[in-house]
């Protein structure tokens, strides 16, 4: 969430910055709401002062054993009016918060201006796509041929956009998660967490998924029921990891906080009808290793480069060709002020596909979750900055390995870095 005071103070500048994201701020609405809030705030304060004055008068009269009925009646009328004004103030504040929750984050100055993904900028390429002397097969063809990917049985169980993995491919899927977690905990300084896969509405609001992306989730219960008994399956471990520090004040010397978790992720893929209905690319359920950093504001720019590098190391050690993309203003996610996507090479498609998204949310998520830190120098309390990254999406990484490491016979070579995690296995056939 953007700071309300910042919007009011610099409304023209904020409007211009939000237009870059294809978001048009309703200036009239937000200024009118703020004007109502100010008037009600003043009225409440005046009535509180009147009430306090009446209380003092009543106390003095009591001491002198005089009749206080007239003053009590006056005090009661003030209290009734005060409660009415408080309710109106509460209502207008709620309206302001509701509108603020629909406004995306302000972009970093270095984000390129553009309408959509066509205007994203490639900032780096690593590795070269292999040249094959045989006809390339897709990961679906290879997996089904060796009978280790079963989409027909998964459809029987759950419908489209699911998969049943077995035998050596299931083994590699597990090995990938172990490799990623070991890399991030042993070499990159993250602490591993096991987190709930069901979260309540407040957690999704805190990380910015709600209210904008309401239709993207699978719900265990309707959110129209009691808030504490309503759950959604997590779309990413970013949600529970970030909310671990919700409503907390962290001493500055404990920053940065670096967390990682391997979880299944659940997404309805609303708006993706007909796209990638078969395969490991766009599924309702997939596994991912997530990395999250909570840092002081002055370190968040550096932290984004670091978190992206940590995701890149996974691809480099797997020897998978990829490219690093800086998202333009029109393609940057709702909560993010700056995002890099990592896209891995898919031979059967002859193109790169997204396998990681690394974002700096600045103080957008921390304002919603009230995650703050106390400075060592002056004990002042400020909002933290929060960053997150996929490191990596396991199913898509697996699909890329199957295709990039395929042999003429339709087998799959095991990347060297994964062999120790698979009892030295070198070939899946």
Swiss-Prot record:
KW Nucleotide-binding (keyword) present: yes
Pathway of action: Aminoacyl-tRNA biosynthesis; selenocysteinyl-tRNA(Sec) biosynthesis; L-seryl-tRNA(Sec) from L-serine and tRNA(Sec): step 1/1
GO MF term (any one): serine-tRNA ligase activity
Catalytic activity: tRNA(Ser) + L-serine + ATP = L-seryl-tRNA(Ser) + AMP + diphosphate + H(+); tRNA(Sec) + L-serine + ATP = L-seryl-tRNA(Sec) + AMP + diphosphate + H(+)
InterPro entries: aa-tRNA-synt_IIb (IPR002314), aa-tRNA-synth_II (IPR006195), aa-tRNA-synth_II/BPL/LPL (IPR045864), Ser-tRNA-ligase_type_1 (IPR002317), Ser-tRNA-synth_1_N (IPR015866), SerRS_1_N_sf (IPR042103), SerRS_core (IPR033729), tRNA-bd_arm (IPR010978)
UniProt xrefs under CDD domains: SerRS_core (cd00770)
Annotated binding of L-serine, by residue: 236-238, 290, 390
Residues binding ATP, per UniProt: 267-269, 354-357
One protein family per Pfam: Seryl_tRNA_N
Enzyme Commission code(s) on record: 6.1.1.11
GO biological process, one term: seryl-tRNA aminoacylation
UniProt subcellular location: Cytoplasm
Enzyme class: ligase
Keywords of this entry: Aminoacyl-tRNA synthetase, ATP-binding, Cytoplasm, Ligase, Nucleotide-binding, Protein biosynthesis
Cellular component GO terms, alphabetical: cytoplasm
HAMAP family attached to this UniProt entry: Ser_tRNA_synth_type1 (MF_00176)
Physiological role: Catalyzes the attachment of serine to tRNA(Ser). Is also able to aminoacylate tRNA(Sec) with serine, to form the misacylated tRNA L-seryl-tRNA(Sec), which will be further converted into selenocysteinyl-tRNA(Sec).
Comment text on domains: Consists of two distinct domains, a catalytic core and a N-terminal extension that is involved in tRNA binding.
NCBIfam families: serS (TIGR00414)
Family under the similarity heading: Belongs to the class-II aminoacyl-tRNA synthetase family. Type-1 seryl-tRNA synthetase subfamily.
Assembly with partners or alone: Homodimer. The tRNA molecule binds across the dimer.
Protein name per UniProt: Serine--tRNA ligase
Source species of the chain: Wigglesworthia glossinidia brevipalpis
Gene that this sequence comes from: serS
């Amino acid at each position: 969430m953007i700071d309300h005071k910042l919007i009011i103070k610099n409304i023209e500048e904020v409007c211009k910055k939000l237009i870059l994201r294809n978001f048009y701020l309703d200036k009239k609405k937000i200024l009118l709401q703020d004007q109502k809030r100010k008037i009600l705030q003043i009225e409440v304060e005046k009535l509180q002062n009147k009430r306090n004055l009446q209380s003092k008068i009543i106390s003095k009269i009591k001491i002198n054993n005089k009749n206080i009925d007239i003053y009590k009646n006056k005090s009661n009328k003030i209290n009734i009016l005060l409660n009415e004004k408080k309710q109106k103030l509460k209502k207008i504040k709620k309206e302001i918060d509701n509108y603020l929750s629909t406004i995306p984050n302000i972009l970093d100055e270095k984000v390129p201006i553009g309408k959509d993904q066509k205007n994203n900028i490639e900032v780096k390429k690593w590795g070269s796509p292999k040249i094959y002397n045989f006809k390339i097969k897709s990961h679906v063809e290879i997996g089904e041929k060796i009978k280790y990917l079963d989409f027909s049985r998964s459809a029987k169980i759950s419908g489209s956009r699911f998969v049943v993995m077995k035998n050596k491919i299931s083994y590699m899927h597990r090995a990938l998660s172990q490799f990623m977690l070991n890399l991030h905990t042993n070499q990159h300084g993250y602490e591993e967490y096991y987190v709930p896969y069901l979260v309540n509405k407040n957690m999704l609001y805190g990380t910015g998924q709600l209210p904008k992306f309401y239709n993207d989730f699978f719900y265990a219960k309707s959110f129209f029921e009691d808030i504490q008994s309503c759950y959604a399956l997590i779309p990413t471990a970013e949600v529970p990891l970030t909310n671990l520090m919700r409503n907390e004040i962290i001493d500055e010397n404990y920053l940065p906080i670096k967390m990682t978790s391997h979880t299944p992720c659940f997404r309805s893929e609303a708006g993706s009808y007909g796209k990638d209905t078969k395969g490991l690319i766009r599924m309702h359920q997939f596994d991912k290793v997530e990395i999250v950093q909570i840092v002081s504001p002055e370190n968040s720019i550096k932290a984004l480069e670091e978190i992206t590098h940590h995701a890149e190391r996974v691809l480099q050690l797997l020897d998978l060709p990829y490219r690093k993309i800086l998202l333009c203003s029109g393609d940057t996610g709702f909560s993010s002020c700056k995002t890099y996507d990592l896209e891995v090479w898919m031979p059967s498609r002859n193109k790169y596909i997204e396998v990681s998204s690394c974002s700096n949310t600045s103080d957008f998520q921390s304002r919603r979750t009230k995650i703050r830190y106390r400075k060592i120098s002056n004990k002042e309390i400020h909002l933290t900055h929060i960053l997150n990254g996929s490191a990596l999406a396991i199913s898509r990484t697996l699909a890329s390995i199957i295709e990039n490491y395929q042999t003429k016979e339709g087998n799959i070579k095991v990347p060297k870095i994964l062999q120790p995690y698979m009892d030295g296995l070198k070939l899946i056939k």
